[in-house]
């Protein structure tokens, strides 16, 4: 289930197997930035796709290049911002919500984990305004997802709310189109 990678370190990063990631990185540091032959994902991108903080932290300590792009022209930051709850997460939240708000705490925990992931990447120097093959920046994705936690982080890191994607929309345009007035206000103040 999920993605199958041709590079073992990418598969290990995707599956949260720190032992295997460590083994490959120890064998040769070039594996830290190896790109999968199918979609160009690096181990860092693979770990960010799934929100695996320990793997991301390990790869950043090994000086993984945070600005490498895959074949969709996306960096690890694009995936960190796009990280959503899995079906299993939603199922647990729904089932546990009535039980002493455990579901709520699970949701808050997952949101904090995502925020931590994005902070780690920003602190490592990821290019905050990198665009993917459709011209989307991480800020575009955060606006689409109405992520009021990540947008201030991205703006603080100098994300440009006026960059337009291939559809001619800026992050501000997206927020206005989706009627996210608080986000639009944040973006207007930043521009």
UniProtKB/Swiss-Prot annotation:
Keywords: ANK repeat, Repeat. SUPFAM superfamilies: Ankyrin repeat (SSF48403). ANK repeats lie at residues 39-68, 72-100, 101-130, 134-163. Coiled coil: none annotated. InterPro entries: Ankyrin_rpt, Ankyrin_rpt-contain_sf, ANR22. SMART domains: ANK. This is Ankyrin repeat domain-containing protein 22. It comes from Mus musculus (Mouse). The gene is Ankrd22.
């Amino acid at each position: 289930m999920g993605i199958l990678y041709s590079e073992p370190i990418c598969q290990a990063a995707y599956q949260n197997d720190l032992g295997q990631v460590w083994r490959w990185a120890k064998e040769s540091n070039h594996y830290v930035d190896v790109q999968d032959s199918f979609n160009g994902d690096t181990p860092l991108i693979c770990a960010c796709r799934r929100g695996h903080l320990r793997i991301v932290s390990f790869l950043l300590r090994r000086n993984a290049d945070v600005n490498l792009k895959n074949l969709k022209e996306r960096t690890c930051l694009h995936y960190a911002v796009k990280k959503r709850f899995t079906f299993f997460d939603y199922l647990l939240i729904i089932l546990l919500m009535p039980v002493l708000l455990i579901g709520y705490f699970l949701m808050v925990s997952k949101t904090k984990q995502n925020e931590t992931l994005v902070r780690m990447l920003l602190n490592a120097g990821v290019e905050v305004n990198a665009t993917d093959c459709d011209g989307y920046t991480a800020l575009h994705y955060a606006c689409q997802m109405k992520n009021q936690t990540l947008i201030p982080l991205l703006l603080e890191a100098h994300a440009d709310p006026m960059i337009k994607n291939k559809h001619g929309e800026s992050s501000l345009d997206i927020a206005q189109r989706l009627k996210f007035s608080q986000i639009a206000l944040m973006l207007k103040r930043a521009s």
